[in-house]
Amino acid sequence: MKNIPESKFNSKILLFGEYSLIYDSMALSIPFESFEGTLTFSPVKLNNEQAKESTAHMAQYAEYLKNLIQAGELKFVLDIDAFEEDIAQGIVFDSSIPQGYGVGSSGALVAALYEKYAIEKIPNTAELGNSQLIKLKEALAQMECYFHGKSSGLDPLICYMKRPMLINNKQSIDAVGMPETNINGKGGIFLIDTGMTGETQPLVNLFVEKCKEEGFLHVIKDELIPFNNNCIKSFLKGEVKDMFSNLKELSKFLLGRMSPMIPRKFRQLWKQGIETESYYLKLCGSGGGGFILGFTEDIEKAKIELKDYHIDVIHRF
């Protein structure tokens, strides 16, 4: 059995840009170090049954990639023989990243496979220019389509680059610095665990179908995208008041126009935050379950209002 260098790939959080990214909005995504995955022959996070399942899933995935290669469609050169050989030897993706939680379980796997098996791969260095980042995102998007039917490539890009990334539009990507965490800050960003998983593909399909209605696409472009983009700009500049005024509108839009993406039992909680202005909730990834993102100007007040839920604070300001 081979020894392989075991690179770790973290989960990610899409702070802003879910769904609107499909129609060329801005997006901001950050690595999330609470969860990680590694390609290995000696798993420590998975039990025997899970390890066998991981290897079997990778065998199916290898078939998908092989078909793309044989059709001359894969956007980069992949050492499929080495991948299949490692699958035969029992390689697994030893991951603590929860699936269906909107934190990039498939993105981390794609990033790990690209790093190990891509020939002449684009390196994950800070010096990459925009054209290389676009090319890399497109290659990773093609790989991730297997899991979701449609992929922007952003999740695996974050997992691979291991740094916050700002999508300005489909043709412009930058590595960015996050505003500094103020450990004594009153405000913060937090996660709520819904305790259920969400399925990305059906929800993305639902959204895309809905956008075929001219009226719905109109409000996406005239309301959702401006709220989203303004949130990103003000967050990166540290303009808290402006960010929260846009967050309130963004949260209201998601509840009013995209409620199928919000688990039913959390809709009242969502509404409560908007009404009390103690916190604002938004989707974390495609929704339907997994984590919900929350923003508050007073984390202690929000904790009292959300005392029945497990809250994980991920950033303070």
Locations of the language-model features?
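Gly/Ser-rich catalytic/binding loops embedded in alpha/beta enzyme cores
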Residues: E33
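Gly/Ser-rich catalytic serine loop of serine hydrolases
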Residues: S96-A108
